[in-house]
Amino acid sequence: MKPSIVAKLEALQERHEEVQALLGDAGVIADQDRFRALSREYAQLTDVSHCFLAWRQVQDDLTTAEMLLDDPEMRDMAQEELKEARGRLAELEQQLQILLLPKDPDDERDCFLEVRAGTGGDEAALFAGDLFRMYSRYAEARRWRIEIMSASEGEHGGYKEVIARVSGDGAYGRLKFESGGHRVQRVPATESQGRIHTSACTVAVMPAVPEAELPQINPADLRIDTYRSSGAGGQHVNTTDSAIRITHLPTGIVVECQDERSQHKNKAKAMSVLGARIRAAEIAKRQQEEASTRRNLLGSGDRSDRVRTYNFPQGRVTDHRINLTLYRLDEVMEGKLDNLIEPIVQEHQADQLSALAEQE
């Protein structure tokens, strides 16, 4: 490994020990904000620290084995140990390179998940419902909380559009590669001839950012409409104009929220989603202007970004970005997504590593 990388790892190791000591300090424990910030930093440094300590240990083992090569009685054993240590060293160096990759500061945040029915009418709305259920199951398995912010139900079930907040450690970092077009091929329940129909949905995932970090929105740029909510809610539905529709005039972004009975709460929820959408649009524009020729595995949430095809007759799901096909569609629809998410995360890391190599 390059001396500059080793020096960086030594500095991180020292900081890990320093933070560990600070977390035991009474003054730090009394300051809850600082304690929380240091706890997060400690958690982020722990993996790289442990990996670097393991790398150092293997380096020591390697040196010991090389010294034993001069001893005729120990040579065979030393050669075996050398082979094993070199293999382990290569593995640890690869892990350390990945751990040192620049982190997306949004990765640890909660996120907003939007699923919208596209082409395909009722069948697209039903599939949007299936996708939302799939993500909900995945969130439950990871002990994340999922809260519907706004939903427009399809006439025959499912959703025309559903927006939810997913709260939990690393929710955005795990789900961010889901943005884009999701296509389904299956025989609809209403199809009497048994013909396979193709319909589509779009998914958009945006980090939920604290209000202080959101773009400043000029109230004069907003048009706010109120209307009577529809859908579930019993006697309280359609009795007051509690539903809110906010239009951001400069961008044309529209957010609706009718989940709460209180107009004030619906407005607060809609504003948080609007801020996240405006921020996401600004970041996407900036990335486009930087116009990297390198492929971007992070979809824009546009249907033109083909993410996956879910083929029910064949029981397969295909990720078009990395040409990955799995014949485990039933498991995937039940929320077992790690076999799809992990390869795309690894591919993204490989792209980052090759970008760093080109810069050196």
Swiss-Prot record:
Residue segments, region Disordered: 285-304
One Pfam family it belongs to: RF-1
First-listed, main subcellular location of the protein, grouped into a coarse class: cytoplasm
First and last residue of the signal peptide: none
Cross-referenced SMART domains: PCRF
InterPro entries from the UniProt entry: PCRF (IPR005139), Pep_chain_release_fac_I (IPR000352), Pep_chain_release_fac_I_sf (IPR045853), Prokaryotic/Mito_RF (IPR050057), RF-1 (IPR004373)
Places the protein is found: Cytoplasm
One GO MF term: translation release factor activity, codon specific
Modified residues (N5-methylglutamine): 235
Keywords (A to Z) from UniProt: Cytoplasm, Methylation, Protein biosynthesis
Keyword Oxidoreductase: no
Top-level taxon: Bacteria
Record note on modification: Methylated by PrmC. Methylation increases the termination efficiency of RF1.
GO cellular component: cytoplasm
PANTHER family assigned: LD18447P
Protein family: Belongs to the prokaryotic/mitochondrial release factor family.
Function: Peptide chain release factor 1 directs the termination of translation in response to the peptide chain termination codons UAG and UAA.
NCBIfam families reported for this sequence: prfA (TIGR00019), PRK00591.1 (NF001859)
Name assigned to this protein: Peptide chain release factor 1
Protein source organism: Edwardsiella ictaluri (strain 93-146)
